Structure formats: C-alpha cells, structure tokens
Amino acid sequence: MAYSFTERKRIRKSFGNRESVLTVPYLLQMQKDAYIAFLQADRAPQKRMVEGLQAAFQNAFPIVSHNGFVEMKFIEYNLAKPAFDVRECQTRGLTFASAVRAKVQLIIYDRESSTSQSKVVKEVKEQEVYMGEVPLMTDKGSFVINGTERVIVSQLHRSPGVFFEHDKGKTHSSGKLLFSARIIPYRGSWLDFEFDPKDILYFRVDRRRKMPVTILLKAIGLNHESILANFFVFDNFRLMDSGAQMEFVAERMRGEVARFDLTDKAGKVVVAKDKRITVRHTRELEQSGTTSISVPEDFLIGRVVAKNIIDTDTGEIIAKANDELTELLLKKLRTAGIQNLQVLYTNELDQGAYISQTLRADETADEFAARVAIYRMMRPGEPPTEDAVQALFQRLFYNPDTYDLSRVGRMKFNARVGRDESTGPMVMTNEDILAVVKILVDLRNGNGEVDDIDHLGNRRVRCVGELAENQYRTGLARIEKAVKERLGQAEQEPLMPHDLINSKPISAALKEFFGASQLSQFMDQTNPLAEITHKRRVSALGPGGLTRERAGFEVRDVHVTHYGRVCPIETPEGPNIGLINSLALYARLNEYGFIETPYRRVADSKVTMEIDYLSAIEEGKYVIAQANAALDNEGRLTGDLVSAREKGESILVSAERVQYMDVSPAQIVSVAASLVPFLEHDDANRALMGANMSRQAVPVLRPEKPLVGTGIERVAAVDSGTVVTATRGGVVDYVDATRIVVRVNDAEALAGEIGVDIYNLIKYQRSNQNTNIHQRPIVKMGDKLAKGDVVADGASTDLGEIAIGQNMLIGFMPWNGYNFEDSILISERVVAEDRYTSIHIEELVVMARDTKLGSEEITRDIPNLSEQQLNRLDESGIIYVGAEVQPGDTLVGKVTPKGETTLTPEEKLLRAIFGEKASDVKDTSLRVSQGSSGTVIDVQVFTREGITRDKRAQQIIDDELKRYRLDLNDQLRIVEADAFDRIEKLLIGKIANGGPKKLAKGTKLDKAYLTDVEKYHWFDIRPADDEVASQLESIKNSMEQTRHSFDLSFEEKRKKLTQGDELPSGVLKMVKVYLAVKRRLQPGDKMAGRHGNKGVVSKIVPVEDMPHMADGTPCDIVLNPLGVPSRMNVGQVLEVHLGWAAKGLGQRIGDMLQAESKVAELRQFMDTLYNKSGRTEDLASLSDEQVVEMAQNLTTGVPFATPVFDGASEADIMTMLQLAYPDAVAKAKGLTPTRTQAQLYDGRTGDAFERTTTVGYMHFLKLHHLVDDKMHARSTGPYSLVTQQPLGGKAQFGGQRFGEMEVWALEAYGAAYVLQEMLTVKSDDVVGRTKVYESIVKGEHAITAGMPESFNVLVKEIRSLGIDMELERS
C-alpha cells in the first residue's frame, strides 16, 4: 500500500481485524454538496437543474400584471466574483458573499391587436437586475457573516407526506384507541382526520374547528351514494310477502351468531338459532348449493339502505341512501313493488359503520353547501359568495402557488397509500383524500399498522441549501407582490426591469436567516474536532421543528433506525438531549433528504465488495449481518447462525438468509465518538461525556499525538481543514514559518496555468472561542509531495493527526485526599514543561465616532496622562506590537469632545494659564480590562473613505503589500526558472543565425555559450529553424503575459488596501488590538480523559513529592481509583495499559537508535511490532532512510490504533506489554509479571506503597473551563437600579450572592454583626456603604447600618396593592 508523506513518517499500528472496505467519506460532504446544489455556480445557466436558486426564480417568475398585458420573465442568473476573500472579510468585519444578478425580460403586449387566445408582443426589454447578495460557503463548510465564522446546522424535521397514528389510549378514560391521520405538505395547509370516542370521523384544516369528514367528501364532489359505495360492501335482499331472501356470502356469515334457524335448500336446519356459525357450517351450505337464505322481517329492521330507492311509477324517493330500515319503510317498499334491496354490510369486528354514522351527523345537502361550511370554518364572519367559496377551496389544496406537497411528500404519500409510482402532482387530488380516509377507516377496522413518527424514514434532513432556498423564496415572494402592483405602470411609462425590482426584501430575508436564525450558529472553533462536529450536527429544533419544552421522551430516544445514520452516543446533556444529534461516520443524504448508510451486498452467503446505500425505509426489507460476522478465506459467512438485524430487531439467522452486511464496526457512531479508543468498554453515559468533552479540549502549545488512538485521527484532522494539504503534487521549493512554496509537477500543471502553489500559513489568529489558530510547516526544502499530503500542521494536530491533549503518565491511587471526588493531582514538571500551556487571543476594539459635539480622535495627546503611561504608544496613539500589557494599561489613545460647561473664575484663570486643550476633551482611551494581561500580537487600523490615514495605518498597508509582492516574486521566479529550463533544452544543439555576444551565423549552440549569456538575452538568439524560433517567441510572450497578470493582481490588491474601509455609520476610524495571553495549568482548571473521566486540578505537587517507580520515573498525574468502578468506564484502564506498552516500545526503538543498531535489526523489530497481530503494514516499501526517520519519530512512543468495536483484545495488550518490557527492564521499573502494575514509592518518604499500582499513559485533555475565566473579585462596582443590590456574574463585574442558606449558617453561629453587615452595608444600604467607604479611607472601621433599599422596594410593592404602610421612627 502507498503511504502519504506524513503517514510514512509515523505509521499508526492498528489492531483492527477487519480490512476497511470503504474509506471514511469526506466529512463535510453533506454541507458542501447542499450549498453547491443551491448555487450551481459552476454550471452554465442553460444547464442548471431546477433546484436551489434556479427553482426559487422559476417559482416566482413569470410575474404577470393584473390586466395580463405586461409580463416579467426570468431568463438566467449569474453570480459575481466576491469583492474580498475570506481572510479579508474576517479582518474587515464583512460578509463573504457574492452578488446575484438575474437577467429578466419585461414583455409588453399590444392591447389592440391581442385577443384572448393569442397576445401580440409590442415591446421586449431585457436587463440584468441586482437581486441581493448570497453568502458563499468557505472551503471549510462555514460562512463568514459580518466578519465572524458561522455554521448553518442541518435540521431534522418531519417529512412531508401522510402519517397515521393513534393516541395510545390517553385521550378517553376507557383507554379506547382513537386513530388519526395527518397530511403534511412542504408548504400549505395541514389536513387532519381523527376519530372521536363515538367513532365519528372528523377532519380539520390547520388545526381549526373539526367537522364531519363527509363534508369534505361532498366538497370534492361525492354524494351520499358514492360515499357509501366507496367505504362499504353491500348485502343483497329480495323482499317477499313476509320476510326476505338474502344472498348467501360465506365470508360474511362466518363467526356470526345465528338470529334464526339457518336451513339449506332442502329445508334441513344447518345452524340452530343462537348458535355461532363456523367454517364447517358455511361449507355445508355451499356444498348443498345454497345461494340465498330466508330471513325473518326483524333481521332487516335497523339495516342501512345503500342507495336511493325510487318509486318507478311516481318518481318519488321512497328511501334515501343511509336511511335505516323500519317496519313502516318496509311496508312502503312492498306497496311500491320494490323487490330488490341493497343494504350496507357492517359488523362489530372488522366492518364498522363509521362513515355511515358520520354521514348522519353531517347536515350539509350537496357539494356547494359542503364548501360553504368549510368557508365558514376558515373565514368566520365573512359572507360566503359563490366565487369566494370556490376560490378558497381551490386555494386550500389545489393551487400550486399556495400548496406544495414537494417531490418528497408525493413520494412518501404514494408509498404510504400503496401506489407504485413515486411521482405525481405536487398538489392534493380528490383520489388522495379518499385514499387517506379509506386507510384510516381500515385502521379503525383493525387492518394495517400505524406509523412510527420517530422512524428515520419519516424524518428528513433539511440542509443549508434548502434552508437558504426557502429564505430566498420568501424574499422573492415579497418582491413579486410589489412588482405585480407596479407592472401596470410599465405600459404608460418607459420603465426598465430595474425600476420595478427592489432587491431589499431578498437581502433582508437572507440577512435575517444567516445572522439571526436559530439554525445559524456561531461556529464552535475550540479545536478541529469541535469544528467538524458542529458542521455535521443535525438539530430537531428551529423554525418548523420541535421546541425544547414540547418535545417528549420518544422523540429524544435512540431509535433502531438511527443505526449507521445518527450517532446514539453524541448528544448534549441537559434540555437539548436527543434533539441535537450528530451524523454517523459513513452516513450521507439521498436525493429526498433521508439519511442513508452503506452496506455490503451478500449473495448466497458470500460477502461481495459491492456497496449499496440504504435509507431507513429500504433497510426494513432486508436481513443485515453485523460487520464483525465471521468470514472464511473466500469471504463467505461461517457458522450455522449469524447475528443479524431484521426490521430493527436483533435475530440469529442462517447464513443463506443474509442479504447485506455492515461495512465497518464504527459505522454506528459519529466522528467524536469514533475517536474514543476502547469505546466498547465504556458505559454509554460516560462515552457521551467523553465524546462531548473532546470538543472542549483547548489547543495546547505543543500538540502531541495520542499514543492510543482509533485510526480516525488523520481523517478528522485533514477533513476539518485545520491542516494545510497540497492541492497538487510537486517539490517543496521554499519553506519558512509563514509560507510554503511548492513547484508543481509538470504532469499536474495544466497548460497555461502557473506551476506554483504558495501556501500562506495562519499565524496566531483568534478563533471564535478566543483560542489560538496557528499553522506550522512540517515539510522541508526538496521534499516530494503528492496531491492531498499534509504540508502544515494546525492547532491541535500533530503530523496530520488530531491531537487534542497530551500523553500523561497516570497512576491510579489515592494521595492524601487531594484526589477525593474526582480531583486531579498533577506534577509540577507538567507545568514546567509547558505541556498544558495554551495561548488565548483576545480582540479589543475601539472606534472613533462622529459625535454632536465634534469628532472623536485617536491620538497620543491625552489629557492628564504621564509620559510613562504613554511610552508604549506610537505617534498615532496606538500601542506597538510586542508590548506586554497589564490591567489598566492604555492600548489606544482616544479623546472625545466634551460639552461646554460654565466655569468658575478660578477655573477660567487656570485655563488661561495652562491652555485650552485639556479641558474641552475627555479621555475615552481603550485600556486593558481587569483580569486581562498579555502581549500585543497584532494591530489593525481601519479608516473610512475620505479620512486621512495616520502613519500606523499606512505602515500596516505597506507591510501587507510587501508580503503580497514577495508571493508574486516567488511565483514569477519559479515560472521563469521553468521557462528558461525549457528554452535551454530547446536551444542546445540547434544552429543559430546570430545572437548576443557576436554569435556567428551557423554556430551550433551549446551549454557553455548559454551559461555565458544573460538568461534574459536568450530571446535575442535567432535560431535557423523556424519551428524553434516560433517556440522561443511563444515562451517569451507567455512570460510577458504572466508578468503582466502579476502586475495587474498586485495593482488590484493595492487598490483594495488603499480604498476606504466599510465601517458602521458614524464611525470614522476603528482600531483592533489583539492580545495573546499564555495560560498555564493551575488548580481550578478542568481536565478530562476521553472516557468521560473529568475532574478539577486540586494541587500541583513538586516532582520530588510525586509517587515514583523503582527506576525513579515519577507519575505525571495521580487519579482516584474509585472513579472507575462506579462509572463503568473501563476503557480508560485498557487505554492506560496499551499506552504503557506504546511508550515502552518507543523507548526500545530509541535505545536501538542510540546503540546505532543496523537498519536490518530495526526493520526486524518493527516487523515483529507491526505485523504479528492486527492489520499488517507494508514496511518493505519504505527505504532505509525512511525507516530511520520513522524510528526517530517513534522514540516518544509507538502510536496505536484500536478502532471502535474492533479494537485490541486483552491478549493483544499483553503481547505488546511483553514486547515493550523485557524481563530486565520490567525488573528495573518494578513491574509486576503481567507488566500491568508497578510498585510505586512515596516521593516524600521514599517508602514503598502498600500495594502495586496501575500505571500507564493516557491521553489527557485540558478543557475550555479555565479558572482564569471563571474567577473574579469585587469590592465596589455596579448596582441594580431598583433593588440597589450588587449585580451578579463576572461579565457584569458582580458580587458573590450570599443566599438564604448562607444566612442560616450565620444565624446558627450567632454571628450577628457579620449578618447585619451582609444584609445592609455589603448589600443594599446605599447611605451605609458610602459611609463605610469614607471611614475606610479615613482609616476608621466603624459601621453604621441604615435601612436596606429592599425594604423600601417592599413598602412600594405593598402600596401598589392599595395598602398604605409607613415606618415610624421612634
């Protein structure tokens, strides 16, 4: 196998027993594909699919005027190139977006010449119209909105279609199941059907008042007879003089109790009265040739007439359909000579009379009356004119403008009602309504099953593209209304399309969605894993989704269809549990938005390499084996029974029945969960915490790869976009800390393209969470790269692998109570080595505005500040980069004009003596806030157009241009070197007709001559061969063209930088100062492993006091062993053992390198290590130099991969431990024979501890809950306006709440003075606290408590209730 540039530097030993048949797909595919489909920017306008922007435009256009003589048609749209790139937008606080320009035609028809059938075109005006700006997605799947990176989270919502359910017996006290159906369109009115406890079927539109369903059936054109014919089968009777003959239908008789003696043709009694009719009885009757049965008169009484019965002589209706038969009615029928009679066949069991009963409750007579009833329900109080009634009914379900079932809805609807085709009209049809009512009645009759709304076949994902399209449609709909009103004017006035279209509604809709929607979220950038997880999140919340308060347990619970689609582990703790989920590792979306997961096809128990993606609906049809099913050498399933799943149930089946098999054991979990080694040994709750806390790990100064990983680390790092990967293969030409220049391979450089790739690295950039984004090159000059190779590491990555923590030597033992209740004891060495030191960057902004009293000014000339306080500011009043600042230091000097105040004579005198300036401005400089300190790492100055730039702003622009020129020079250098190489090959050996340095005609060109001539003069050589001469000329033209294009791009960049910045209104100048703060580990910081084992640092202990091994190796961290058994996260113990083996193996390799062993010995040891168990590695493909380089990288520990659910077994761990620690080493370290525990010694006394201790290496993380951010102190500060009590919280510089229980504690101690102080002067006694302050200033400590303000508030509250209460002072 071929290893990438970084993989071969450090191969991760994998214990996976199953070769992956499918590589993990690109993890941001869902987001990126959805937005590409929305924009279709790369497709030619005429080849665009009807989706996204194209669909939105086609839906809104053409717009026709009210009179029909003016029409506006949409032709195509184009996206302009964005004015600024992503980094520029972030710096300037702009939105990374592209302008949409739509080409529209305004067609005016001739009124005189046009007829109703055909219109004659009078005039056509075509124009490109600006249609707002659409934000563009960055390469990393995020959006830059107003300078900040945001993510649009995908929404999991109920799919359009029809759903049948029941209330589970909760509505009625008897526990009767009340069935209901709901037709949900993508856009339009919801239609509900529901049974009530009396078995009458009702319908509702948009959850309004319920009405009998037969009203709706009449409104769609059915009458009583057709309604009954659709829902019932009929019994046929022939009336006799007394009684009647009933047509014998065996199925209908079976199971009934005979109400009279049943006789056959011969008159023999087959079933006696009151006996149940069985299958034997009906068979006897059939065999005797019985076709009809005599029934008594009372058998007909109460039966329901199926059709209208008309007297043929008079034309009078004797009985209407749905009338009940009575003695009187039977008499009438006989008198009229009616012999044949059809009645409804009903029974209690599976043929209920529900529709018949509903029809009886319905008072409407015909179709129009039914529609009027619906109109009155929808528009109460409005007069129902015929036109209005018909228009409303059409608009409810039959108008494509107001009702859209969507492709998904139609597919789901047809599938549910049992139709074969998946396409059809996007509006409702009469057949649809009838089909739904039939199925609902069938369900009530006991046939069929209700739907499970939590099944992923009934929930679909709305991605960013679809959500943005809906917003764009909203904007276009608003435009449509406005344009329709104004189109009439276009006939009289010479208006162009841009006069009619105002793009503001579109811009407003998009701005509102991307800036403020619940699904548009501030991107979590704590570390690369947090970034990637945020983009793969699916939320059930948001517009059109659920709300936290109303979501029940069922929606939140893990469903069988989540398998391979949604992670059952990763979800937040708290009120959002189960509502926000993560996409599983291999999951993708199908064309309808349903989540699919891949499976390998199995044919005749042989597992093939064919892979099919199945949605939750399709999966229910198959038997699917697990990924760890045993296979023989030919890939056949072995064993009599195979563990498999069918319809969500786990079953054991024979190998022949299996149709599919999982592609990977890790396919059920998400990215974050798949990064937890030994996940299968952790309790689910702790695994959830582990996956969630991995996202909160702060990037540390020197990232370190996990010794025990899962093999997904590289995929996650590369797909997150944190690392820099080579876009094309080539050779590294130049490297420094800020840029990498790669000379591209000839094969990959397209004709006419510049064969140079320059990667500018991000240095000390602030993330959304104030962590540090920083890239470091990992290549050197001359390295050969292939496309996709990692060339630079980012934050929290190490050699292209995700590295969110540090490998620490852990000991599980109590230590003087310092690790009680999950506290963590840590060695001073960890702090000294900066293992957990992180850099945090704060952005501080100051704006100079235009005020009523004059303009604010950014200056060094600030009143009442000493020179010492100003010594770090430059002449522009801005601090220099590199300054170390403390709380209160001035960063940017700013003065604001003050209002004129009347001055006393003394002040006037002082002003006259000391000058005017100091008094009419006040100091509003930007200073370092309390609790902050650090180093200034960057300053950015933005100036509004028309305002003169200061020196600092000009210097920043010059530096930026210098950097850009450097890039262009590098590109030009490589392009020219490449061109001159080609020229040299072209000219050597050719005959010349003359050239520089008096080259004689007919001279053969050689290398010596060319070396002697200046390269730029090679173009002056005149080759004798015309072909060579033309090639030389074309190379020259190409070089000149390249140089010209570089000059143009430099000019464009200069223009961008020198033009004025877009600033908020009223702002003249804005300065951003970036402070970098180093945060070392300290007590109070939160730390965690990857298994949900979290804790707070309790003490940092000197190295010499830490428990140590026999050879003097001290532990880095001591954890409490009691934290393991009750939490059931045993994975951490296995990780510690395997980490211990990894470290030992690294030390053995290090010893071999130190002893300068032969490469053959190294290869042999590595072969034993990599190829004796687990997945084998192709070490033979590496050269000796590469083996040595890899060995040097392994000295700190051999990285292991233990894939989830397919990881290292106990035997594997033991093998590695034995290999890592030969007997001599184990003895020196004081290890037990199994190498899993060691004898530790107390660092303070040197005594051995009572028993051996589990020690080993664990990947431990520092989380983004730092004590520095949480802790603060206050003496005086802001107070609440009404109660006059101090505010709460660090952000408000608030105080500590002394609550009810704390008051009880003081009361219990009898600390009366302290209590009085707490309730008065330290809280809300305004006068008292002022006096205390004064007395402290004077050096006295007397406290005079007064009246708390809260008492006055209470008095006011009581007075508001009308009770006057006064306080009498005695």
Curated annotation (Swiss-Prot):
GO biological process, one term: DNA-templated transcription
Reactions mediated catalytically: RNA(n) + a ribonucleoside 5'-triphosphate = RNA(n+1) + diphosphate
Stated family: Belongs to the RNA polymerase beta chain family.
Source species: Polaromonas naphthalenivorans (strain CJ2)
The protein's name: DNA-directed RNA polymerase subunit beta
Quaternary state and interactors: The RNAP catalytic core consists of 2 alpha, 1 beta, 1 beta' and 1 omega subunit. When a sigma factor is associated with the core the holoenzyme is formed, which can initiate transcription.
A GO term from the CC aspect: DNA-directed RNA polymerase complex
Xref: Gene3D superfamilies: 2.40.50.100, 2.40.50.150, 3.90.1100.10, DNA-directed RNA polymerase, beta subunit, external 1 domain (2.30.150.10), DNA-directed RNA polymerase, subunit 2, domain 6 (2.40.270.10), RNA polymerase alpha subunit dimerisation domain (3.90.1800.10), RNA polymerase Rpb2, domain 2 (3.90.1110.10)
Domain of life: Bacteria
